Amino acid sequence: MSWLRTSPLRQSLTRSGSSSGNGSSGTATTMRQRPIDAATDCDPRACYDSFCKHWQQAHEIIQHPGTPTHDDVLGVVSHLDYMVTLLLVELHHCNKVSLPSADAAPPAAPCLEYLLSENLLDKLYEWASSTGRYANAVRLEQLKLYELLVSHSRHQLLCHEPFLRPLLKILASSQGEIFPPDLEKRLVILLNQLCVVLMQNVHLLDLFFFSAQTQVQEQIQNGSLPAPKSGTTTNFIIFSLLIPYVHREGSLGHQARDALLLCMALSQKNSNIGHYIAQYSSICPLLVTGLGGLYSRLPNSIEINSIDWHRITPDDVTEIPELTLFMNALEFCNAVVQVAHEMIKQQLLDFMYQGFIVPVLGPAILQTNIDSQISAMSYLDLILRSITEPGLMRAFVKFLLDTEKFDGERILDALVERLHSPDANLCMVTMALFDTLLGLHCEDLMLELLLKYMLPGKHVPISHRHKINKIDPYLNTTEFFLELTPDVMKRARDLARPKSVQELVDPAATATTTATAPSMLLSLPSPVMSKTIGANWNYYGHYTGDSLYANVQAYLFEAHSRIAQCQRDCRKWANSYRYQKWPRQGQARATAHALELARQFFSEFGTAAPVVAAPVASEAGEKQLDSLQSIGESSGYESFKWRPADEDAEGIDVTTTTTASASDTDLEHNNNSSSISSGRRDSWRISHSSRNEILLTDLDFSEDLFAQGTVSLGPFLNAIWSKLQTFTSNSLYVNLHLTGLITRLAWYPLPLIHSLLLRSDIAITSDTPSFHQVLRMLKQQIDAELPVAENSLEIIDVARSYLIDREFRLVNARKITDNSPLHQQLQHQQQHQQLAQTNSHTQQQQQQQQQQAQQRSTYATLSAATPVQASPTSAYDPFRRSDNKRRSISRSITSMFSRRSTSSTPASNGNSASSGLSQIYAFFTGAASTLVGGSGGEGSGARGAAQDSTRGNTCETSLSTAPRQEPQTNVGSSSNSSIGSSTQTLSGTHSSSTLHGVESGLQTGNFNSEPVSLDSVASMGIIANTSGTERSRDLALCAVLLDEWLKELAAVALEQSVVLVTEQLL
C-alpha cells in the first residue's frame, strides 16, 4: 500500500561504493549493457590512449561550424558512449579494496584526470546548448554520464569544480522545462543520487548549496547561462527541481518523494536549507493542495458488499487507485513532519489544518447523505490509523474539538450523534472510528468524551465517593460479572462440564477448590470446546488455528498487555484525573459560603440544631443522631458524604468542626470554650467503632440535594448505554463493535472509569441506567425470553458453533471478492440449496424429527460431543435473516377479529372459526402459526411460496420489531416469556440485521441474496433442521456473545484491580 515501505530510500542510505544506486540499476542503455569484466587486466596506458582518441574525434565534430546535423549528434553520442565505458572500467579498478603497503601509491585514474583537466564536461554542455531539436537527446546522454559518474565515484567528483560547474549548469537549465518521460526519469534519478551523496557526506552540503548561489549567478551575468523562467535564482536547485514530481504516479513519483525526504532530513542538519524550504519554496502549499485534490477524487459512496464491513482495509486501498494515490500523499506528509526542520514542520501543519482538514474533511463529514457519511468517516478512520506523527495527530484532534470553524458545531458531537443511527452500516463505521479514537489514548479526547462529566463525581452518591480512588483488593468483581451470565448459558456450561471434575484438576485439591473458589472452574475449558479452544495459544501473536472460545487465559493475557500499553501512554498526560474531594483548609470565602448554606439547610428542617448544640450523649441524642446519619443511607437524596475511618490521622481545623450550630448566638456563645468545641466534635462521634464519620467539611452543599438521578454522564456514554440496552435487537456485528468499544474503555487504568465500569460496590446515580443495571436487564430479558429448555440448549449449541466457525473464517480465510472462484462457488451452492429446499421439504422434516429424537438421548453426554465446525466454503448459517418465522402482533390480532371474505379457502374458514382468546393465547405460547396460518400440512407445503410472496413486504413497528412473517408450523422451541417482559424488551427499534436482510432481498430480487462476506456464508443445511423462531435464534446468539463478553470483562476487572492496587501501594 505505501510507497514508503517498499521504497528504495531505505536501501539507498547504505549503498556501497561499487553499487550503482537507484538510477544506475535502472539504466537500460548501450553503455550499461556492455560487459565490464573486473577480472580482466586492462592496460591503463591503452585505456587512456583510447579515451583521448575518442574525445579528439568527438571534439572535431563539436568544432564544426553551423547547426549540428543528425549524423553529428549520433557521432558525438557514440564516442561519448565509448568514453563512459572506459571511465567505468577505470573507476571499477580504482574502487577495488586492496591491502595497504608501505610503497603503495594511490590508484591512478588518468582518464578521469583528463576529463577534469580539459573541461570536457563543460565543452560538451556548451555544444549541447546549440543542438536545436536534438537538445533533449544530447541532454539525456549527459544526464546518463553524470548519473554513472556520481554513483561510481561517490563524493569525490563533487569536490572538483570542473565536474560541479557543468552539473549545476545543466540542472539550472532544466528548471521550468517540460521534458519527455525518459528524460524526466533520468533527471529524477540523478537528483536522487545527489541527495544520497549529500546525506552521506553532510560536509559537502554547504559547498554545494553556496556554489549553486554564487556560480549560477555569475554565469547568468556573463551570459553563458540563461536565466531560469521563474525569474529568480534558487539557492537549493536540487530541491526546486524535485517539487514538480512530488505527486507523480509510479516509480518516478517514488524516486522524487524519496529525494525530497532526504532534502527534508538535510534541513535538520543545515538551518540554511530549512530556512530556504520554509521561506522561499512552495512545497508546503503544494503538498496540501495536492492532498485536497486527491481527496476530492475519492469515491463519494463506497460500495459495501458485506454486512460486516466497517472500515477500509489495506486490501481496499490497493484495489482503489484513487485511494492509493491519496494514501501515498498522506504518508509522505506524515514523513515530512517527522524528519523535517521545525520551521518546515510548523508551516506544513498550519497549511494542513487551514487548507485540508478544515475546508475539505469538515464539510465531507458533515454531509447529510448516509452513504456520504459512511465514506467520509471511513476515510477519516483510515487517516487516523495511518498517521503516526504526534504533531499531525494533534491537528486532527484539534479539528474534532474545534467549535469555531463549523458555526459552533463540533465534529466530535456530530460523530457521537451518529451512534444513535438506526442504519447498521453507519453505526458500525461510527463505532469503528471511536474505537480508533479511544486507541489513540489522547488526553483531550478522553476529557471531552468522558472525564469532564465524571470529574465532579456527582454521578456517584456522596456516601460512595471516597471509594473511587481506593481499590479494595478483596473485592471480587470477577464473580459479579460471571453471575450476570444468562441461565441458559450456565446450564449449557454445566452440561458441557464433565461429570468428574477430578479429571481436570488435582484430586487432592478438588474439594477445597470447589468450596473456596467455585468460579475458578469457569477458567477451565469446557470439553465441548476441547477441539477448538486455544490450547496451542503461545501468547506471541501466532495463531495456531485453535479457537479462543472460553479461553479465559487468553482474555487475561490480552487484558494485561492492553492495560499495560494504555498505562504507559496515560503516564504522559498532564493530569492524573483522580476524584478530588472538597478542600478542608484555606479559601475562607468558600468556607463562609458553605456555612451559610448549612445554616439555611438546618433552619429549613429545624431539628438538627438543638441536637448537635448540646454536648451530651444521652440515648435520645444518640437516636436523633442515628436518625440524622440514616439520611445518607436510606433516603434517595444522599445528603452526606461518609468519611472512612482510615482518614482519622488527617488534620482537622477546630473551628471547622464547630460549625454544626444552627444559629449565630450558639456559635458566639461557644467560641471561647475549647472544651465545648471538643465536646461538640465528640457529639458527632457517638461511637468510635462506627465505620463512617460525618464531617461538615466533606459536605458539598453547593450541590442540589434533591437533584440526584439527574446527573448526565455525557452524550457519548449515554449513546453507548442506549445502544447496549437494545443489545438483543441489534445485529451481531453491531454488538461485536459495541462490546469491543466498551472493553477498550475498560482498559483505561483510571479510577473514575474503573469505578464506572468495573466496580460493583459503587452505585451510580445518573439520568440513564448504569452499566451494571443494563447488564442485569439484559440477563433478565434473555432469561425471560430464552428459558432453560431442551430446544433452547439446542439453539445455543448451534449459535456457539456458528461463532467458532466465524472465528476460523476471519482468521484463516482471505477476503472473498465478487469475482473470486470461491464466491462463484458459494453462489452456486446457494442456488442449489434453494432448489433443493423446495423439492425435499418432506425429507428435511424427517431428518429434523430424527435429530431431535437423537439429541434428546445424547444431551446427557453433551460433554463428549464436538461442536459443529463448518468449513469456510460450507453453506451453514444458523441465523439466516431471511427466515420467515416471526409474526406481527398487530396483524395477528387483525386476523383474529377481522371478517373473512366469502372467497376464502376452507382452511382459512376453519381458522377463522377459532376463538379470539385461544388465538391470543396461542400467539404468546408459540402456537399462533397453527391457528392462523392454516393446517400443518398446507403450511409446510407452502413454505417456499410464502417466503417468495412476502419478501417484498415492508417492515412495520410491532411487538416483535421485525418484518411481517408468514405462519410456520414449527413451534417446538418458541419462547414462553410473559407478556410484560415481551412488551418491555421488544418494543424498541427494528433489528438492524433483520432489516438489512430484507433490504438486500428487495434490491436484488433474490430471497437468499445477502451481501456476501466471510460472515454471510449461508449455512442453511443445519439451521434448517434446528427448531426455534428467528427471535429465539437471535437471542441465543446474543446469549453466547454476552457470555463471552462477561468473561472478558471479568478478566479485565481482575487485571485492572491488580494495576490500580499496585499504584495505590506505591
From Swiss-Prot:
Domain of life of the organism encoding this protein: Eukaryota
Composition skew (Low complexity), residue ranges: 12-30, 655-678, 822-855, 890-913, 972-997
Official protein name in the record: FHIP family protein GI14169
Pfam families, per the entry: DUF5917, KELAA, RAI16-like
Region (Disordered): 1-35, 651-682, 821-913, 935-1007
Compositional bias per record (Polar residues), positions renumbered to this chain: 1-11, 856-874, 947-971
Family: Belongs to the FHIP family.
Phosphoserine: residues carrying this PTM: S500, S820
Alphabetic keyword roster: Phosphoprotein
